[in-house]
Curated annotation (Swiss-Prot):
It is found in: Cell membrane. It comes from Saccharomyces cerevisiae (strain ATCC 204508 / S288c). The lineage of its organism: Eukaryota, Fungi, Dikarya, Ascomycota, Saccharomycotina. Residues 1-10, 136-145, 211-302 are cytoplasmic. The chain crosses the membrane at residues 11-31, 115-135, 146-166, 190-210. This is Protein SUR7. The modification Phosphoserine is found at residues 293, 301. Belongs to the SUR7 family. Involved in sporulation and affects the sphingolipid composition of the plasma membrane. Probably involved in endocytosis.
Amino acid sequence: MVKVWNIVLRLVVLLFLAGNTLLLILMIISGATDHYPVNRFYWVQGNTTGIPNAGDETRWTFWGACLQDKDGSDTCTSNLAPAYPISPVDNFNTHINVPHQFISKRDAFYYLTRFSFCFFWIALAFVGVSFILYVLTWCSKMLSEMVLILMSFGFVFNTAAVVLQTAASAMAKNAFHDDHRSAQLGASMMGMAWASVFLCIVEFILLVFWSVRARLASTYSIDNSRYRTSSRWNPFHREKEQATDPILTATGPEDMQQSASIVGPSSNANPVTATAATENQPKGINFFTIRKSHERPDDVSV
């Protein structure tokens, strides 16, 4: 059952990485073509009637501003450029009939959208490489840590890009409304952007879970291998034998006479009693042993 759950979770992470990569690609190609469904992907749409060099409606996409005529046709080929800002002043090179907030907050619109453009590309690079390497982790577990690191950077840049672009689009919508012009956010584009952020969060959590679990499993396996190695019988290992304490007793003339008087001349004394008496004696170590010599009293050895 555990293996089944592992396979299911791996497939979920793989599916989320693939979906996240696809969402980022769809956002990046918005504005690159006039065909359906890509022409439905835009950040914000506003009424630009009366602004020179602009159409009746203008949609700001990832690559630039798409002009929409009254018949509903889109023209996205004339105003395309990398890091195209949501700024009618810079897009149409005019201040005439441009909403006032686009003029007073020109720098904010300019830098928010340009930085988000760069961050989206960086996020796509990290997420895309993470997706490719995660497929290879099924064959080699050495790439798991690298996938986690790359996905962490992808999560940070993707979230930053979506936050910056959402802020710029909301400010643009409010600027059109303050000038009594109609404007709306692109629901499809915003949905894909925040869906990619959600997928990044889920992917990051799952990858951290897998990394921590792999570390714990490796540590547990190492401990078990050490235990098994130490518990095996080694023919070249010899356990130390416990040395018995020597029992030394002092023997002298008086002791010999006392023992002789106790035992007596009879040779049929009970050896068990003598052994028990010997065991009951207090054990200790006497450093001096005196031996009696019949030849000379001076031959006493220490």
